[in-house]
Amino acid sequence: MGAGEITTLIIGEVLLTLATFSAVIALIVFSIRKPIRKHKPLDMLIFDKIKPAVNTVNNKVMLFITFLGKHQFLIPANLILIFYFLLVKKQTWFSIRVITIAISSLVLMLLLKQLFQRKRPLSPLLKAAKGLSFPSGHAIMAVTFYGLLIYILQHSISIDWLRSFLTILIIALIILIGFSRIYLRVHYASDVAAGFIIGLLWLLISLAALKWLESYVTSL
């Protein structure tokens, strides 16, 4: 089998796998979307609990942390990873993982927002965010990007303590990115919690599917 045929096979298998998973998730969320369109009392309670911590310094810190989950940061970060693995490390499959997970996570997030149609909180702390609220795009993209980074670290760093230390730092960053969206009152806590769960499930499914695909293609 030639290189062109293998490339076509890879693209076809990736698209088919992701389309299947997307269809299943879409069917599930379509059946439960109505109860989620409105925020819950717990969401408002969490806003109230955070209020005493609101001040100018914390506002600046939260704005910086939330930036680490924005597309303005994640797009260049993904591109750096792609070119690093493709051109420097010569590890094509890691590049494929980055591209596939980044794009599919974005598509899934946009699809779910349109399905649920939940409005954002009415009183943002500093500045209103655009788009719909559920699930949190920052939470989904933070889990899939930084979670993939953890996966890469597990396969790249041989020093146990350093690998564990960096993993803990990245997990803390993911949690803080989600918290920053609640602090800034641009998402309800339930938006963020759902984003974390969806992002983690999608990351695990994508990694498993791509690992199987890599094994299948390399065996040809």
Predicted region positions:
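N-terminal transmembrane-helix/juxtamembrane module of multi-pass inner/ER membrane proteins
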Residues: 1-73, 115-121, 125-126
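Membrane-embedded catalytic cores of phosphoryl/pyrophosphoryl-handling enzymes
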Residues: 2-4, 122-220
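Alpha-helical transmembrane segments of integral membrane proteins
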Residues: 12-17, 93-101, 162-169, 194
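Alpha-helical transmembrane segments of multipass membrane proteins
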Residues: 20, 24-25, 29, 105-109, ...
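Membrane-interface helix-boundary motifs at transmembrane edges
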Residues: 35-38, 85-94, 157-161
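Hydrophobic alpha-helical transmembrane segments
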Residues: 69-86
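Interfacial segments of alpha-helical transmembrane regions
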Residues: 83-107
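Transmembrane alpha-helix/helix-exit interface in multi-pass inner-membrane proteins
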Residues: 102-118
